């Protein structure tokens, strides 16, 4: 997450306290750190987590095993309604516990510091106190990681880090002194533990995983993820350091070499919609296995093609049309009466701001999900845009029905490629499978796996898991394969042989 890859959706996480932690010792004296799942507002969670982890500075992830008597670590993961997976670590002596996302898309470890006393996001989460640790060593090098419009700022320190039953000594990490409240205030997790390569560290710090290997704490230079996508089950998933758990996959893994150190990046082939080639990536695309991202993200052209095939419509477009349907006729009546146009939206309590914005700023406000909400946010912007079009149509003496139709056309023209897209929940069973060619093998995901269903019955909302992200590289367009892919496919990150492997998860 602290790197040049970026996502477009960013919103608040709903804040719930972490459940009590359960400890148990099993096979070979391995310590299992169990966490409970919370039932939370899944729509807000996926908006928040889904792509704040695809950032100009990036982040997220978590898993399990059946290993030998020693040389491995297991961290039980909490499934936060299919939008984030996190587990518990300890920093210092005695250990101070933190819930962290295990993120293969970044490489730094950071947690809030007791020196962070002005950001609410720090204050409401556990904070690391160097004065309470006998193994703390100062560093002081400043660090910052950008997350879209949010960021963390802090400084490096060094201490022991406990992950499962493994204790990593002399680990550099960031104590945050500032955290963006919009991004982190209501997050379930306290910090992030990066599992990417050192090349993308904000301060070129040696990552936790490197030190596990260098200090001989694991038998194999391998870690693996199993993500349980069944939100109703207690076990959220497991991250295994030092090996894999054969209980959580079927058959053999298909391995592909890492093509660019930094991210866990590899070469991917054609993308199929149903059983038909999309024509994209047939000549090769770069792909990144990223536990810190909920969605699939890829080039706009293919994402648009997929979303059209599944009948997806932009959330912004639908919200705009809903406003027009509910308030359009009243707005027209007010425009033809004596109410000042720039007062109508506030009069209808759709804006808290009395005044007018120019059209350009309105459009930018809609596209920028992190715009200043002091004037009422997106709904206010939709209202102001609709009024501008209505005034023009009234001058042309258009009928009320024609005016409404023309304003709906404006709603259809709002940019949607980087925003959430919704689908008809009743049509999921008829949607096509999407397949990715990796190592000459097809890896399919079903509609049930790439659609988020929020709520039940008539109140249900179904959201496409495909979002646009245009990043060009020397290797070609880049895809991000997040938790929606790593759920169906058990994933192995082989540091020793610099390869990534996928097998059907069970």
From Swiss-Prot:
Q: Where in the cell is it found?
A: Microsome membrane; Protein storage vacuole; Secreted, Cell wall; Secreted, Extracellular space, Extracellular matrix
Q: How is its activity regulated?
A: Inhibited by the specific aspartic proteinase inhibitors diazoacetyl-noleucine methyl ester and pepstatin.
GO MF entries: aspartic-type endopeptidase activity
What does the record give as the active site? 103, 290
**One Gene Ontology term from the biological process aspect of the record:** proteolysis
Whether Signal counts among this entry's keywords is yes
Prosequence residues removed at maturation? 25-70
Q: How does it assemble?
A: Heterodimer of a light chain and a heavy chain. An intermediate form is produced first, and undergoes proteolytic processing to remove the internal plant-specific insert (PSI) and the propeptide.
PROSITE patterns to which the protein is assigned, alphabetical? ASP_PROTEASE, PEPTIDASE_A1, SAP_B
All copies of the Saposin B-type domain together span 315-417
Purpose of the protein: Aspartic protease. Cleaves alpha-lactalbumin but not beta-lactoglobulin.
Q: What is its main location?
A: membrane
Residues annotated as glycosylated are: 139, 252, 397
TM region(s), chain numbering = none
EC top class named in words = hydrolase
InterPro entries linked: Aspartic_peptidase_A1, Aspartic_peptidase_AS, PEPTIDASE_A1, Peptidase_aspartic_dom_sf, Phytepsin, SapB_1, SapB_2, Saposin-like
User: What is the relationship between pH and activity here?
Assistant: Optimum pH is 5.0. Active from pH 2.0-7.0.
Tissue specificity field:
Detected in pistils, but not in seeds, bracts, midribs, roots, leaves or stamen extracts. Detected in seeds. In stigmas and styles, detected in the transmitting tissue and in contiguous subepidermal layers at the longitudenal grooves of the stigma (at protein level).
Q: List the disulfide bonds.
A: 116-122, 281-285, 320-411, 345-383, 351-380, 425-462
Q: Which family does it belong to?
A: Belongs to the peptidase A1 family.
Q: What is the name attached to this protein's record?
A: Procardosin-B
- Organism superkingdom: Eukaryota
Q: Which UniProt keywords apply?
A: Aspartyl protease, Cell wall, Disulfide bond, Endoplasmic reticulum, Extracellular matrix, Glycoprotein, Hydrolase, Membrane, Microsome, Protease, Secreted, Signal, Vacuole, Zymogen
Q: Which residues form a coiled coil?
A: none
Its GO CC terms are: endoplasmic reticulum; extracellular region; membrane; protein storage vacuole
**Is Signal set as a keyword in this record?**
yes
């Amino acid at each position: 997450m602290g790197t040049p890859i970026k996502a477009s959706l960013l919103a608040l996480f709903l804040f719930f306290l972490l459940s009590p932690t359960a400890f148990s010792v099993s096979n070979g004296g391995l310590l299992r750190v169990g966490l409970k799942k919370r039932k939370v507002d899944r729509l807000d969670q996926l908006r928040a987590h889904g792509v704040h982890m695809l950032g100009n500075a990036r982040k997220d992830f978590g898993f399990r095993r059946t290993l030998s008597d020693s040389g491995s670590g297991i961290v039980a993961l909490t499934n936060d309604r299919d939008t984030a997976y996190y587990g518990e670590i300890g920093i210092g002596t005695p250990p101070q516990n933190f819930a962290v996302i295990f993120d293969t898309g970044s490489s730094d470890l950071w947690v809030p510091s007791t020196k962070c006393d002005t950001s609410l996001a720090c204050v409401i989460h556990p904070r690391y106190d160097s004065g309470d640790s006998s193994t703390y060593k100062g560093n002081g090098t400043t660090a910052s990681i950008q997350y879209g419009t949010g960021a963390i700022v802090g400084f490096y320190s060094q201490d022991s880090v406990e992950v499962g039953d493994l204790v990593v000594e002399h680990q550099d990490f960031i104590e945050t002194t500032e955290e963006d409240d919009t991004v982190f205030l209501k997050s379930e997790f306290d910090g992030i533990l990066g599992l990417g390569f050192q090349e993308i560290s904000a301060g070129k710090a040696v990552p936790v995983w490197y030190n596990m290997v260098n200090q001989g704490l694991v038998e194999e230079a391998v870690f693996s993820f199993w993500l349980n996508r069944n939100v109703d089950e207690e076990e959220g998933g497991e991250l295994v350091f030092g090996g894999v758990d054969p209980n959580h996959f079927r058959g053999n893994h298909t391995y592909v070499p890492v093509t660019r150190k930094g991210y866990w990046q590899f070469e991917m082939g054609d993308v199929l919609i149903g059983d038909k080639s999309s024509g994209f990536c047939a000549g090769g695309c770069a792909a990144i296995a990223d536990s810190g991202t909920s969605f699939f993200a890829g080039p706009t052209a293919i994402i648009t093609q997929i979303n059209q095939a599944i009948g997806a419509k932009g959330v912004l477009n639908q919200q705009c049309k809903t406003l027009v349907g509910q308030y359009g006729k009243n707005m027209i009546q007010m425009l033809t009466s004596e109410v000042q146009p720039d007062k109508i939206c506030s009069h209808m309590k759709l804006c808290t701001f009395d005044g007018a914005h120019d059209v350009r700023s309105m459009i930018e406000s809609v596209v920028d999900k992190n715009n200043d909400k002091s004037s009422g946010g997106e709904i206010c912007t939709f209202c102001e845009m609709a009024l501008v079009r209505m005034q023009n149509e009234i001058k042309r003496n258009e009928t009320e029905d024609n005016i409404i139709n023309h304003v709906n056309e404006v709603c259809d023209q709002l940019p949607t490629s980087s925003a959430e897209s919704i689908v008809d929940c009743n049509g999921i069973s008829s949607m096509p499978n999407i397949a990715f060619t990796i190592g000459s093998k097809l890896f399919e995901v079903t509609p049930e796996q790439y659609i988020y269903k929020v709520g039940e019955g008539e109140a249900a909302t179904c959201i496409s898991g495909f979002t646009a992200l245009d990043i060009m590289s020397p290797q070609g367009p880049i895809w991000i394969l997040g938790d929606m892919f790593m759920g169906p496919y058990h994933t192995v990150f082989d540091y020793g042989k610099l390869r990534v492997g996928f097998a059907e998860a069970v």
